[in-house]
A protein has these predicted regions:
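Glycine-centered coil/turn sites that cap beta-strands in beta-rich domains
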Residues: 416-458, 510-512
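Surface-exposed loop and turn segments in beta-propeller and other repeat-based domains
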Residues: 29-37, 79-83, 132-159, 197-225, ...
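Beta-strand-rich domains and repeat architectures in extracellular enzymes and scaffolds
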Residues: 32-65
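Conserved beta-propeller blade signature
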Residues: 55-57, 100, 174-177, 185, ...
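C-terminal tail/sorting-segment detector
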Residues: 499-523
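Short, compositionally biased serine/threonine- and acidic-rich segments at solvent-exposed termini, linkers
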Residues: 311, 368, 379-421
């Protein structure tokens, strides 16, 4: 039987990418409050959330980042006890002045490395002050929960391991969280207490209010537990709660504060593509409401990954983008954006799709070396409106539908006194794992120029034999830049493992300067 803990890795590989991408060679620049530092926390961004008049929040594998000026500058938060959880940020949700975040880190266990809930945090004042909330756990004796006047049997979740909050949804009254083994919970007192919410079993399509619940709410694999009790995504508004699990899409209608009536849609009783539901979103346009879900194959051989959608409240379903692994959604009136493993798709009718090319920044001479687009948001607060994306290799925004991009990444400066004048990252570099685009990995050799110049990159092996010589590149303005290398020699053959030396030559105003740095290649 397939274990459902492992599909989560596809999202948390973002944090692994961070280890190679967002390392720091020097102490980051502290801000006045000593709780934040300048720049992005990491280059792997899984969620972008807009708040207030100008704030953008970024969930990265290295922590929480914020821009208060539409990307002109960024600050990031140190993990601080009683304030910000450690590790990567697995989810963000904002409502008015309130923002919630959740953290994740890896724990080493007997069966390997497993994602672990690092807890949550909230701010009531747009992120100025934060309160930490421990990852919700149960006492070993908490085997029952009062629900709809009945005592419902729950398996106590006593560890944060596999109890990771992957999604948060806010209403004026509740914060809802989906925490995989921790199930679906909600709080009406800012995390001082949590209420566990029962969902239908794998064998049931409906769970009515007033119905006696005879099974245990248990996230273990069948036959001991139910895949439908593993919560991965949640979306709440009004009296409606949508929950995505490892066994389908659950539509809940709150009939009272103590009961939610559930109807479950899965690949066996409806036309959704698969039962593992990793993302959900609601599009409202011109009086029409469409519900979107990224649905992956779970256990049945008849399931497949695609985007599932319903425009009649779940009564009927259809699929689109068959074969695509979805991550997230964004909307701009009638326009739909779908973030996938293949890149960012756009549609004006929800049926016919265009795929964006990978983002390139002609001003900074940067490319996002990642097909994976994990998140997107359309921000109309800044004229004329921008589309933001988050990838495994950085974030970017465009105001002209992808013709021009501005790319933002975190790396150590090469122009500050005491910092290296040139360096390679990631280092060590794996051409088969790092920054994969069009089948090639990429390493960047970062440097700065004081003005207009021509630069040329050359790579030598340990015996100082030339293996690669790049074309001369013309740079028109002072600044920091990076030359990419795909780990191949001049004949197009991937180089062997070993130590290599990178030579960067700068020609400016008739003078030539040469800089060297060392690079280790490990496939």
């Amino acid at each position: 039987m397939k274990k459902f803990i492992y599909p989560i890795l596809s999202l948390l590989l973002v944090a692994s990418a961070l280890n190679a991408q967002a390392f720091r060679l020097s102490k980051p620049s502290l801000t006045a409050d000593n709780r934040t530092y300048s720049g992005l926390a990491g280059n792997a961004a899984t969620q972008i959330e807009a708040q207030g008049d100008s704030i953008l929040w970024f969930a990265t594998g290295g922590g929480l980042s914020r821009s208060s000026d539409f990307g002109q500058s960024f600050v990031s938060y140190y993990p601080i006890p009683d304030s910000i959880p450690k590790g990567g940020i697995s989810s963000i949700a904002a409502l008015d002045s309130i923002i919630w975040i959740a953290g994740v880190f890896d724990s080493t266990t007997k069966i390997g490395s497993i994602q672990t809930g690092a807890g949550l945090a909230f701010s009531k004042d747009f992120g100025r002050n934060w309160t930490y909330v421990k990852q919700p756990l149960d006492s070993a004796s908490a085997t029952y929960e009062k629900w709809d006047g009945d005592n419902v049997k729950f398996l106590p979740v006593v560890t944060p391991v596999s109890n990771t909050t992957w999604d948060i949804s806010l209403t004026p009254k509740y914060v809802y969280i989906a925490s995989w083994a921790g199930g679906i919970r909600r709080s009406s007192d800012f995390g001082a207490s949590w209420q566990r919410i029962p969902l239908p079993s794998d064998d049931d399509d409906v769970l009515e209010c007033g119905e006696k619940i005879t099974f245990q709410i248990n996230p273990n694999d069948p036959p001991k537990g139910n895949h439908n009790h593993k919560g991965f995504s949640v979306l709440a508004y009004g009296d409606t709660v949508w929950v995505g699990t490892a066994n389908g899409i659950n539509l809940g209608i709150a009939e009272s504060d103590s009961c939610i009536r559930w109807r479950k849609y899965d690949a066996q009783n409806s036309a959704i593509s698969g039962n593992f539901v990793v993302a959900m979103a609601r599009q409202v346009w011109n009086g029409k409401e469409t519900f979107w879900a990224a649905t992956l194959s779970a256990e049945s051989s008849s399931e497949y990954q695609a985007i599932s959608k319903s425009s009649d409240g779940g009564l009927t379903w259809s699929t689109t983008l068959s074969g695509e692994r979805g991550y997230n959604f964004a909307f701009d009136d009638s326009i739909v954006y779908v973030c996938t493993e293949s890149g960012l798709f756009k549609s004006i009718d929800g049926e016919n799709w265009a795929l964006y090319d990978p983002a390139e920044d002609s001003v900074r001479r940067e490319t996002l070396y990642s097909h994976n687009v994990y998140t997107a948001v359309v921000d109309q607060r800044e004229f004329p409106g921008y589309l933001w994306i988050g990838t495994a290799d950085g974030i970017a925004k465009t105001r002209d539908d992808g013709i021009h991009w501005s790319i933002y990444r975190q790396s150590v400066s090469t122009k500050t006194k005491g910092d290296p004048q040139i360096y390679a990252f990631p280092n060590p570099f794996s051409p088969t794992h790092h920054n994969i685009l069009n089948g090639d990995g990429h390493v960047r050799i970062k440097y700065h120029v004081d003005g207009a110049a021509q630069v040329q990159l050359e790579i030598y092996d340990f015996a100082m034999r030339a293996v690669y010589k790049g074309d001369k590149q013309s740079i028109t303005a002072a600044g920091e830049y990076a030359e990419p290398w795909n780990g191949r020699n001049s004949d197009g053959t991937q180089v062997a493992n070993g130590t290599y030396f990178c030579k960067l030559t700068q020609e400016s105003r008739g003078k030539e300067k040469t800089y060297w740095t060392k690079l280790i290649v490990v496939k």
